[in-house]
Design a protein with these regions (language model features):
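Copper-binding active sites and cupredoxin-like electron-transfer domains
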Residues: 1-218
Length: 218
């Protein structure tokens, strides 16, 4: 949003009723939005963020699958794995020491029965953002990113053939790749304790025929 505070003051709603505002999306790209009410860091740490994709006027080239993934964190008074209701820890937030990392608002999201799916030969497009406070080292285990639109810019040419990329806090990217081999592929923050121990992991399940020309055991 091009305007003071990104429209924050125009959307502060009190007891006198709803508010609305209008803006023109003039720049194509992948953008993060978040809460702007005090205490802003606390609200963001509790999931008040999301992604907006502004397509170019001519539209986007077609792909077979599109997915949106947002990384964030949770700061709890309890330790990792502690059961029951977990109260928010302002101390951990100020120390920038999250208890958990999450995709789409929960740990181990998009895994198992919630995994995202594609077929061999599909062209996959992913919009990935970091809504909260800690940058992400985004990586797909077993896949190379064919095209990376760094910082979510859709008006700049993509970077080709990328293994891992950094997404800043409050930033986003778009990636495209073709899946050649069936199986399960993990989407992770490659600071791997965040994925393996703290929850920043998702699963892309690819179905279809084997492709021994690309991948096979000996």
């Amino acid at each position: 949003v091009n305007g003071p505070g990104g429209g924050a003051m125009l959307t502060q709603v009190g007891h006198d009723g709803p508010k609305s505002f209008q803006f023109k999306a003039t720049k194509p790209g992948v953008y993060v939005y978040h809460c702007a009410s005090p205490h802003i860091p606390t609200h963001i740490a509790n999931g008040m963020y999301g992604l907006i994709v502004v397509e170019p006027e001519e539209g986007m080239k077609p792909v077979d699958k599109e997915f949106y993934v947002m990384q964030g964190e949770f700061y709890t008074k309890g330790k990792i794995g502690e059961k029951g209701h977990q109260e928010f820890s302002l101390e951990k937030l100020l120390d920038e020491s999250p208890t958990y990392f999450a995709f789409n608002g929960r740990t181990n999201a998009l895994t198992g029965t919630r995994a995202v799916k594609a077929k061999v030969g599909d062209r996959v497009r992913m919009y990935i953002g970091v809504g909260s406070h800690i940058p992400s080292n985004f990586h797909i285990i077993g896949e190379v990113i064919d095209e990376l639109y760094i910082d979510g810019s859709l008006s700049s040419p993509p970077i080709k053939d990328v293994q891992t990329t950094l997404i800043p806090a409050g930033g986003a990217i778009m990636v495209e790749f073709e899946v050649d081999v069936p199986g399960s592929y993990l989407l992770v923050d490659h600071s791997l304790t965040r994925a393996i121990d703290k929850g920043a992991v998702a699963e892309l399940v690819v179905e279809g025929p084997e492709n021994p020309a690309v991948f096979r055991g000996l």
